[in-house]
């Protein structure tokens, strides 16, 4: 892209991170895997202070990254959707999981994150990173629920000792 094209580029609305995945398990089982920290720790974060409950702050921890955040469920509609607020990259954002039965005991899970703030470059990075993170989470969920396999996708995304910037230099 030339500098002229770059200079004329602008966002017309704040972007939203969005991804989805078909999981070959019934809605109740897929929903439970997101709501219940004892299951979610098998494919996403490594520790949690408890099960999601509306209005109750919960701490999620990714020990491999020395990161923990507080999330608060804003809505839980059993087997339909979970909405949480969490710190986001530049301020609080809203994450929503929706669960739709597809037939034959399968579920389509959709995840969105909205409410990002920042300039255009920051917004594009935040949305790309968030979309990637939730895609890895859903792939890990799929592998765990369908096959009983822990892929460790979230943990392996940023392994210690690997500098991505060094890998992309020519």
Language model: regions and residue ranges:
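Hydrophobic pocket/interface hotspot
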Residues: 30-34, 40, 58, 73, ...
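Short, highly charged C-terminal tails/helix-capping segments
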Residues: 143-170
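Hydrophobic ligand-binding cavity/cleft-lining segments
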Residues: 1-49, 168-170
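Glycine-rich portal/gate segments that line the openings of hydrophobic small-molecule binding cavities
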Residues: 41-42, 47-88, 170
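Hydrophobic/aromatic beta-strand elements that line small-molecule binding cavities or substrate pockets
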Residues: 21, 70-75, 94-101
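Beta-strand/loop substructures that line and gate deep hydrophobic ligand-binding cavities in soluble
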Residues: 89-136
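Intrinsic-disorder/low-complexity, polar/charged segments enriched in Ser/Thr/Lys/Arg/Asp/Glu/Gln
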Residues: 16-20, 57, 68, 81, ...
């Amino acid at each position: 892209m030339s500098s002229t094209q770059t200079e004329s580029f602008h966002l017309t609305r704040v972007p939203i991170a969005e991804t989805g995945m078909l999981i070959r398990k019934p809605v109740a089982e897929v929903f439970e895997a997101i709501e219940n920290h004892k299951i979610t720790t098998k494919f996403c974060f490594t520790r949690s202070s408890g099960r999601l409950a509306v209005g109750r702050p919960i701490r999620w921890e990714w020990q491999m990254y020395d990161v923990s955040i507080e999330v608060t469920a804003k809505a839980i509609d059993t087997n339909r959707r979970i909405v949480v607020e969490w710190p986001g990259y530049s301020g609080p954002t809203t994450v929503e999981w929706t669960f739709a039965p597809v037939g034959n005991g399968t579920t389509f899970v959709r995840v969105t994150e909205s409410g990002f703030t920042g300039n255009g470059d920051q917004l594009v990075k935040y949305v790309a990173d968030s979309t990637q993170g939730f895609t890895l989470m859903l792939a890990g969920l799929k592998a765990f629920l369908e096959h009983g396999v822990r892929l460790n996708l979230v943990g392996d995304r940023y392994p210690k000792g690997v500098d991505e910037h060094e890998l992309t230099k020519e």
